[in-house]
């Protein structure tokens, strides 16, 4: 086990909040492995880089000697987490949940040590709970307390329906912490209300309340919206190595550091040195290559990482980018079609959309397929339309 100071530094790196740090120190002073809880509802089978922000933190705590209890919400997935939703989420069948859970855990073990991870399912206790016990659990909170949640409040004020079972979700998730006697629970910043509910229920049950560690939500490739499949701005960890490499290379030079902070296992000192190198004139592309190779090596292999790098170099060089490439500087974020028009690469947005559909638009040598992607400030990439039109576009 590392020292308390070292453990705190690792825990706090990249974290949004630690609630409550003094309580965490007291737990660490016991010098025994802590029960670290992380729960997920397997509502989809695939993991993307956004999910790995929390899982990476679990791995760090696992390496420090703590016990990772990875909770599969096979019961709660059939309720549907209302967090951040503007409408009632459709429930999944037990069969869908089981299939998703199987592939989800398989991918999780690309990061966590399987032999040191305890997999639990909340159906083990909730499927045995009687109706009277569930009603007793529901009595542990109030409607007023639930309406403190931003998403519930907005729906209520907007006249949108909120089902009773959605009010139960935070209580059910919170009770998981009681059943597991968790010392620490990790989650995204959007889960804070639910995590706090776990603390409240533990106190009511006479348990020492869990410490909460919230991790930031990773923005997607557009640098704006939260990474998600629905926004088509994600990188799946099971995508081919070449795809991962190309997508990492497509992020802006400025936004690259956000990915380093939340996804890389490099030390903060090492990352600071890379920033100094770029400030001194090093090519940001080379730094992005380092990140792409690190991630591919983690999810695939070192050989795949090197192969993807060589493939990228070959394809990029084949584009024969002219030495006198036109540099276009813009000062506002723009959808791809408008961006190409402003840069003079197309005559109209309709032409831009047509070229994208035809697969004739590339960014740093990677074919673009999403006609709805928006490029934010910090963009610094080479755009190609057809075989001969090039422009380096910078958004300040």
Curated annotation (Swiss-Prot):
Entry's Gene Ontology cellular component terms: cytosol
Domain of life of the source: Bacteria
Entry's localization field: Cytoplasm
Enzyme class, first EC level, given as a word: ligase
E.C. designation(s): 6.1.1.1
Residues in S4 RNA-binding domain copies: 334-395
Paired cysteines (S-S): none
Chief localisation class: cytoplasm
Catalytic activity: tRNA(Tyr) + L-tyrosine + ATP = L-tyrosyl-tRNA(Tyr) + AMP + diphosphate + H(+)
Transferase as UniProt keyword: no
Motif ('KMSKS' region): 226-230
Binding site for ATP: 229
GO biological process: tyrosyl-tRNA aminoacylation
GO-annotated molecular function: ATP binding; RNA binding; tyrosine-tRNA ligase activity
Function description: Catalyzes the attachment of tyrosine to tRNA(Tyr) in a two-step reaction: tyrosine is first activated by ATP to form Tyr-AMP and then transferred to the acceptor end of tRNA(Tyr).
Similarity section: Belongs to the class-I aminoacyl-tRNA synthetase family. TyrS type 2 subfamily.
Assembly mode: Homodimer.
Protein name as it appears in the record: Tyrosine--tRNA ligase
């Amino acid at each position: 086990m590392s020292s308390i100071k070292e453990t705190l530094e690792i825990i706090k790196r990249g974290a949004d909040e630690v609630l409550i740090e003094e309580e965490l120190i007291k737990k660490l002073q016991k010098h025994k492995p802590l029960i670290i809880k992380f729960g997920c509802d397997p509502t989809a089978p695939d993991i993307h880089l956004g999910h790995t922000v929390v899982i990476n933190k679990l791995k760090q705590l696992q390496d420090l000697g703590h016990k990772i209890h990875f909770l599969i919400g096979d019961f709660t997935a059939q309720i549907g987490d209302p967090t951040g939703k503007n409408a009632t989420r459709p429930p999944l069948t037990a069969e869908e949940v089981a299939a998703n859970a199987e592939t989800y855990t398989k991918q999780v073990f690309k990061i966590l040590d399987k032999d040191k991870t305890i997999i639990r399912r909340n159906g083990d206790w909730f499927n045995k709970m009687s109706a009277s016990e569930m009603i007793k659990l529901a009595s542990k909170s109030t409607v007023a307390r639930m309406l403190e949640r931003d998403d519930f409040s907005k729906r209520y004020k907007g006249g949108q329906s909120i089902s009773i079972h959605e009010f139960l979700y935070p209580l059910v998730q919170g009770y998981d912490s009681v059943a597991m006697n968790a010392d620490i629970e990790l989650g995204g910043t959007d889960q804070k209300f639910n995590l706090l509910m776990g603390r409240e229920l533990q106190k009511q049950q006479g348990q020492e309340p869990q410490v909460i560690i919230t991790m930031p939500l990773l923005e997607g490739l557009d640098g704006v919206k939260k990474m998600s499949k629905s926004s088509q701005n994600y990188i799946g960890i099971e995508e081919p190595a070449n795809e991962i490499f190309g997508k990492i290379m497509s992020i802006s030079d400025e936004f690259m550091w956000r990915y380093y902070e939340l996804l890389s296992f490099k030390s903060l000192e090492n990352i600071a040195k890379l920033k100094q190198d770029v400030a001194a004139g090093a090519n940001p592309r080379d730094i992005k290559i380092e990140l792409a190779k690190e991630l591919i090596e983690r999810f695939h292999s070192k050989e795949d990482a090197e192969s993807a790098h060589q493939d990228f170099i070959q394809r990029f060089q084949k584009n024969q980018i002219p030495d006198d490439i036109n540099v276009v500087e813009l000062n506002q974020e723009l959808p791809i079609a408008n961006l190409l028009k402003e840069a003079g690469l197309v005559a109209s947005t309709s032409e831009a959309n047509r070229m994208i559909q035809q697969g004739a638009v590339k960014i740093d040598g990677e074919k673009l397929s999403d006609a709805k992607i928006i490029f934010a400030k910090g963009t610094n990439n080479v755009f190609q339309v057809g075989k001969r039109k090039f422009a380096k576009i910078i958004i300040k």
